[in-house]
Amino acid sequence: MAAIESVLTETRVFPPAEAFVTQANVAGMEAYQALCRRAEADYEGFWAELARQHIDWKTPFTRTLDESDAPFYRWFDDGELNVSYNCLDRHLATRGDKTALIFEADDGSVRTVTYKELHARVCQFANGLKSLGVGKGDRVIVYMPMSIEAVVAMQACARIGAIHSVVFGGFSAKSLFERIEDAQAKLIVTADESLRGGKAVPLKRAADEALAMGDTSCVERVVVYRRSGGEVNWSARDLWWHELTQTQAETCEPVWVSAEHPLFILYTSGSTGKPKGVQHSTGGYLLGALLSMLWVFDAKADNDVYWCTADVGWITGHTYVAYGPLALGMTEVIFEGIPTYPHAGRFWETIAKHKVTTFYTAPTAIRSLIKLGSELPAQYDLSSLRLLGTVGEPINPEAWMWYHEVIGGGRCPIVDTWWQTETGAHMIAPLPGAVPTKPGSCTLPLPGIMAAVTDEHGGPVAKGQGGYLVIKRPFPSQLRTLWGDPERFKKTYFPEEMGGKTYLAGDSAHRDDDGYFWIMGRIDDVLNVSGHRLGTMEIESALVSNPRVAEAAVVGRPHEVKGEAVVAYVVLKGARAVGDEAKDIARELRDWVGKEIGPIAKPDEIRFGENLPKTRSGKIMRRLLRAIAKGEEITQDVSTLENPAILDQLKEAVK
């Protein structure tokens, strides 16, 4: 690990503005440090007090943390609650007529629902699910466009104790099939099509394809929401959403579940083949969502209009669209489209139109919008903004400064948030009224999060020295296991080399002299493309499944917009392709990967070689491939290479 060096030096510091501090939920550094001291002095008491303060319990818990079967930690497990009740019912008396969701459709049209209306719709859909035999513990796949209905489907599952597994609408039929099969889903909720940038994307067709790919006899019904009115094939198991719900009652008693009951499974890319079904709990997850909204987003339910641009298919869309904001009774924007349709000012127009106060998006989106110039956002009134956030990958200091100056007018704090699908909620991020920010750093851990940078054995490393990012104590919102694979869970996140109880994030990081964390990248072979985690093994497997391909290796290289670009090295079964033939085959392989996994995984460039650089023991020299992809001079020892002559071939990229 000593080989990890930190080359990023950033010295600018932005203390919170006094006007922000005076109104902040956590006001000033002393208040932040007091929370941290409280957590260190009485760890269980700290979390128990917060859980009692912020969550409505049907049966109060008496046990806070059970570590007897570490690392399978249990939090508040004798308490009973319902997440949907906490997001909807508890607001009805005081906020029933308040707008809950503002749906900004792809074409710019707007629909809104109040808390009362959202509650009624969730109850109707929950009753519909019950009428189809769905109950506590059953798995429901949600393969939906960004919509009010996607949130309704998730909340309805939570209401009856069913376990949802949302699959991003951009994933292919094959990816969907793998998730249906692994979760043994009883029901699928989908739509005819999604609308994105003026184009219709068929979802029902992909669901039909997925269901025809293998043994999916576990699926009893497919509920279809009519989004576009596009043509769909129909079978006996299919049912329209509107027909299912129109006769259902608008009340549905919540099913009270243990705090440890699984709320959802969300699949994330692994560094080896099969996607990992990250399983989250009910009570601990909800607490993480609530606290991070209050602490990191400084949430003010009465005044804020909150907008997180993430799709519900990702963890960000779970915690910071479907659950966190609603648990606090906030008004939020849900966005169907893309930042540049029907025009390049769409994001800024949306902020101005709905008077958005808190805006949370990915560095990828920011970088792509920077390219369009600062004059564009200047055409819109962004004065309603008071807080900006970034998620999905580290933000480079230049993009941070543009975001701060051009979008935030130099007055909005930026919360650069580090967390993962597996952590459920923010882990390291500035509390905006307390912690001074530095462009490019996610700053300091949230109170109660015992984050550290260590060597491969869990030992300390010097300040400024790169190491493994770990969390030393269990925390309420962390994943409980990998669905159906407890051994992989232990091996991946709680390795024996670190004592079996320390959470290994899989990221490398260093801390500066102020203790601030700087994320340096993945320590495994997972790429971060536009804030989406993609396993290199999955892309390699997709390439090799093409009849032309004998062998493939995939690496990432820095990309100024997407964070990382996908670079594929391919050995064909026939002769090495060159010229126009290489371009044609590269195009075919890109489309192939898009069909197998999804468009997000398509290689940005493909390089053809007679073979791949391997050591004499047959191991692919990935470090060498990364250096070639980045255009770096090869300084490492290539004496163990079986065929050094191929290096020149691999330098020729087909874009």
Curated annotation (Swiss-Prot):
The keyword Transferase does not apply. CoA binds at R196, G197, G198, K199, T316, S530. It is an enzyme of class 6 (ligase). It comes from Thiobacillus denitrificans (strain ATCC 25259 / T1). Gene3D superfamilies: 3.30.300.30, N-terminal domain of ligase-like. This is Acetyl-coenzyme A synthetase. One of its GO terms (cellular component) is cytosol. CDD domains: ACS. Its EC number is 6.2.1.1. Catalyzes the conversion of acetate into acetyl-CoA (AcCoA), an essential intermediate at the junction of anabolic and catabolic pathways. AcsA undergoes a two-step reaction. In the first half reaction, AcsA combines acetate with ATP to form acetyl-adenylate (AcAMP) intermediate. In the second half reaction, it can then transfer the acetyl group from AcAMP to the sulfhydryl group of CoA, forming the product AcCoA. Keywords: Acetylation, ATP-binding, Ligase, Magnesium, Metal-binding, Nucleotide-binding. Acetylated. Deacetylation by the SIR2-homolog deacetylase activates the enzyme. HAMAP family: Ac_CoA_synth. GO terms for biological process: acetyl-CoA biosynthetic process from acetate.
